[in-house]
Amino acid sequence: RLSAKNKSGTFTPMKDRFGSPTIFLHWFMLALLAAVYACIELRVLWPKGSDPRDLIKTWHFMLGLSVFALVWIRLLARVRGGTPPIVPKPAAWQTGVGHAMHAALYLLMICMPVAGWLILSAAGKPIPFFGLELPPLVGTDKALAEQIEEIHATAGTIGYWLIGLHAAASLFHHYVQHDNTLMRMSLWRRSGG
């Protein structure tokens, strides 16, 4: 077992790992984010206005909104389940940078889908979500749609860097600092652990 219920009915991590809901959501959301980025990058394989390009952009949006929905569940799991300590304890500045990185990633997973929803709303386009059509957040305003789209694209590039730095930091902690940062979120337990 990766986690156990305490007397208050909340899940608490074993002393050296996050709880299983948090671990599952971390890796599942990574797969979703990879799919979101893949969809938007692969759209260039088809001409503008073509059905395949529109379909892959629709998937980009729907998967992005899925990230938005799941990030709230993930935050709840993290708050209720707690955060196991990093052993050995890193320097205070590393802890601060880690907190800032996590805050930036959560902000990205919340703001980017909302920006996508605003873009489609302002462009006057349908807002699909797996068979549903969501209401627009703002009225039609093509200039606003273009402005938000520029911000969305820039933030998407920043997202690549944030995700890459997050992965690099976890590998640095594991292979250079030899602490349990990576293993706290690993799908597999160390043998004998």
Model-inferred region functions:
Residues L2-G193:
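Membrane-embedded alpha-helical bundles that constitute the cytochrome b-like, heme-associated redox core
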